[in-house]
């Protein structure tokens, strides 16, 4: 038997996993006294975490001539040469990064591709700048977006880039064929067609006006690397098994050892003649928050480490010659409940599970593994969120969980499950934070509403396949959005048409509200609609929000060309083309 402290004292709880083992929880972070979680407004919370509030995109001009624009490092006289050693998750679920939703894909693949337009890595992605398109025009009615392509750009297989490749790439992203699921497709639901007036011009035509900042940011997403039309045609528009997808980016693949290292080299015929500065990159597969990742960067076996644990970040901060930063991740850490299976087709049961979770304890569980913050269904650091001081007065988010547990028990009884539920399949993604949270929530369910779960830990490829197919009762993991705007993730995460609605949740009133949110231009009216949608989710949750993530990155200061201090997420600026090494 093991002892777990869940607020009101110590209780006995038998933990069960798929092997039937009994593991002690003694020594896990939640077995001790929980530190009080910081309270305050969203801006205050950001300051207390050492984070800057997330800033909006810079204004986007309706007409931009970037025919002479060439991206370069922000520092004067950057040096060419050297190989960057990067520690990052590089455990791909498959090779089709358009279909992916994990840094395990894009973190190592992004450097091989270019975008149509991109987020500027020099200002943490706040400005939209040219990429394969050097210039653009946005019609006054905000319904036609025209892009003018560079000439002389070649793919890594020697083929010339044309507008047909851009069209084929975005046609697949916007309207994936059968058997293909792309998490960002929902961003382009207002795009009625993509046309190519000539070999080097591409137009996105919208069925209704949308804000240029929304559409341009959607197009510029780091996930939207351009691939060849022929590559798509040759592989029936599904690139999951294509290990070397030709790209136009600054690097190309040289060697890959599964789950160990992926070696890239500089592409000598890259269209930007001054880039890249590096001769190559070695991506070492190291798990986020792991002691192995921390050890690798602290011992200088890698130059840069993505997503380190807080202990490593603190050590790096006090080590001469090292730098670290923290920024908000574009991800929700959640537990999905399979609405296609009983008893989860009952909103009362879903809300009971929602209320059975003590989110302040969940944050404390991983305080030395992964820095997190309490939040609901909306990015807590965004302008659209319920202010934190108000959120913490809401049942399910209060410091004292007594009221939440009382309501959860009553809901289970009303739904006919007053005696609990046994034998639920709880699928866990194989990362330290998810394993810790799953054990904590397993204990909370058992103690608070007499629900017993069997934990099943799986790697990314299995997790995403089983989540998509519904092969689970509960599953814990993380999903990503592209934008802070709810019109992105409300559609992608919480609607049946969304590619990341892993709970298979469908609420007609919510769907109607999101349609209104998408088209409402008055900020005050739009925010009121968002509040109504939030209230629906509180009563009928599409996912159980666990918490929201903060990223700590660590690097040696001889690495230059890098400005991570105001990132929102880590997917839009993952190309390393302006990185350089200031070594003798």
Functional labels for PLM-detected ranges:
Residues 148, 184-232:
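Surface-exposed binding/hinge segments that line
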Residues 372-414, 431-436:
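Structural transition elements
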Residues 555-584:
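Long beta-strand-rich cores associated with HINT superfamily self-processing modules
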Residues 150, 269-315, 450, 454:
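Ligand-site clamp/hinge motif
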Residues 113-123, 219-276, 280, 291, ...:
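Gly/Pro-rich hinge or "lid" segments in bacterial periplasmic/extracellular proteins
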